[in-house]
């Protein structure tokens, strides 16, 4: 899980979703998991 100021989709499997006001990226590739904070 990377914590970043700006989250971007890295590959085509990445999905940007918002959970409880937190922007997250979920992906089948574990390295691509990110959240904004």
UniProtKB/Swiss-Prot annotation:
It holds the Pfam family Ribosomal_L36. One of its GO terms (cellular component) is ribosome. GO terms for biological process: translation. It comes from the Bacteria. InterPro entries: Ribosomal_bL36 (IPR000473), Ribosomal_bL36_sp (IPR035977). HAMAP family: Ribosomal_bL36. This is Large ribosomal subunit protein bL36B. It comes from Aeromonas salmonicida (strain A449).
